[in-house]
């Protein structure tokens, strides 16, 4: 009975996960932003499942704190202080009580730090990534006839890196279509009708440039789907 309930709970979490990513992808494509609390219900559901069914107390506690810290990322100093403290305390607690989750926690921590400056990812992207990693803890990746267990989070991160390359080339292509320039930015001087949602305009050395705003949550969705297929069919993408 407990196993059946666990399987049902896992299915519900995955349905909410993919539904949330679909909503986020649509919003990101249309507005290049997502609701700041979009991934909160998924995190709450995953927290309940991971604590009540899988007894993962340490990583659940610190992952939740790490996720909540993202709501204060606008205050760089406060965010850096609280996040760094959470990461260190989490490393100690998880190493002692749930060492099998060390890789997953390390990846969550790394992505949470990448939000500083928003150079690679926006806050919404990081919330999506952290919620994907936390809500899929119960999906281990079995290799070598079940003798090796690789966390879903590790394979997801590899796939995320691959789709990030695809996202970069998509950005090149979109910018090239508008400006005829190959690269991450193009001069905006002779370009008319620039969509401010799709393209970001900025100044550099007294010149005006544009950059394509990549709707990255859809690529996070792609990475999640690819990894999930790999888990179900045991194919190490």
Residue ranges and their predicted role:
Residues 1-237:
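A membrane-topology feature that recognizes alpha-helical transmembrane segments
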């Amino acid at each position: 009975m407990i196993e059946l309930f666990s399987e049902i709970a896992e299915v519900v979490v995955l349905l909410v996960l993919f539904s949330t990513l679909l909503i986020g992808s649509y919003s990101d494509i249309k507005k290049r932003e997502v609701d700041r609390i979009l991934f909160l219900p998924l995190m709450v559901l995953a927290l309940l499942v991971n604590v009540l069914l899988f007894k993962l107390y340490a990583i659940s506690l610190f992952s939740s704190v790490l996720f909540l810290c993202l709501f204060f990322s606008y205050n760089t100093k406060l965010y850096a202080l609280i996040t760094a403290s959470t990461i260190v305390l989490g490393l100690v607690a998880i190493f002692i009580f749930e060492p099998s989750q060390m890789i997953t926690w390390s990846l969550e921590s790394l992505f949470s730090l990448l939000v500083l400056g928003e150079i690679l990812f926006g806050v919404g992207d990081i919330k999506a990534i952290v919620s994907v990693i936390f809500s899929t803890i119960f999906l281990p990746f079995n290799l070598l006839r079940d003798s090796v267990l690789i966390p879903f989070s590790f394979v997801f991160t590899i796939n995320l890196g691959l789709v990030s390359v695809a996202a970069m080339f998509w950005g090149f292509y979109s910018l090239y279509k508008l400006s005829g320039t190959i690269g991450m930015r193009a001069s905006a001087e002779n370009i008319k009708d620039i969509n401010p949602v799709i393209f970001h305009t900025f100044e550099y050395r007294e010149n005006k440039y544009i950059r394509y705003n990549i709707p990255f949550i859809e690529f996070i969705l792609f990475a999640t789907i690819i990894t999930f297929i790999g888990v179900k069919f045991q194919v190490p993408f």
